[in-house]
């Protein structure tokens, strides 16, 4: 590890292979916590490259729980977190809208790290059992159309690093790579990131991971979601080509909504917001979810245009299908799925 730390101190980038090997060392129980913390802070100070991100993703996926990966067409819409905006759980709420529109959603997530309520906290409050095994997750994806992958359970080797991340209390490379380490073999992905300068590197990593289509967004105000506040910077991966562009919410009929207007709270407060959106209540929360789910449906290919994606998202909610997916997941995740274990 000393060689890698020395390179980072000197401001040098690591190669993909060096980062892969460093990643395996980070997951080794014999490494000192001080070395892990130093590595994360130095890497953040230098700035992460696509090669470094992909190298670490390789190491983490190698050490993750094994999946059969027989499920075809799965998508994730997990964001990086780390924007400090304290918004409600936009991507988790949107996941049920996607599922209601017919997308298989493998939602990878965690408890709160830099926010009040993480996706796991919200789902637990709603009554979802977040402790599903890989076999159970496969079952849920096939029969319910949505499953939650609790990151610490999927990546047991990360236990010590999670503790150090919490103590550091600043975004690290692990915020960036969270959405990239989903152990399910995804075909498409919608990723919100808090660092605008990482849009292209993250898209390049998604390309290396073999995604058929993907959309990476940095929202107005550096939100790790698409924002109704103003211009959103976007990178689209399609047909193995990467295109950089920007998206204005007004073009799609939305009113401007400041990011402060969609702040969330604790898990109970955020659960109330999510249930309100899925129940069809008109609000700035609903509009934010429609925008994000619409973009995700476009990224998935379920919709040919963003406009069509927003229309499909609205139908998923207003038909009751999105809320039905939540209720199905609550019921199925709490069953004794002995037949699949």
UniProtKB/Swiss-Prot annotation:
Binding site for 5-phospho-alpha-D-ribose 1-diphosphate: 79, 82-83, 87, 89-92, 107-115, 119
Name of the top EC class for this enzyme: transferase
Protein name, entry field: Anthranilate phosphoribosyltransferase
Cellular component, GO annotation: cytosol
Cofactor note: Binds 2 magnesium ions per monomer.
Pfam families xrefs: Glycos_trans_3N, Glycos_transf_3
Binding site for Mg(2+) 2: 224-225
Gene label: trpD
Residue numbers binding anthranilate 2: 165
Cofactor: Mg(2+)
Record Gene3D superfamilies: Nucleoside phosphorylase/phosphoribosyltransferase catalytic domain (3.40.1030.10), Transferase, Pyrimidine Nucleoside Phosphorylase, Chain C (1.20.970.10)
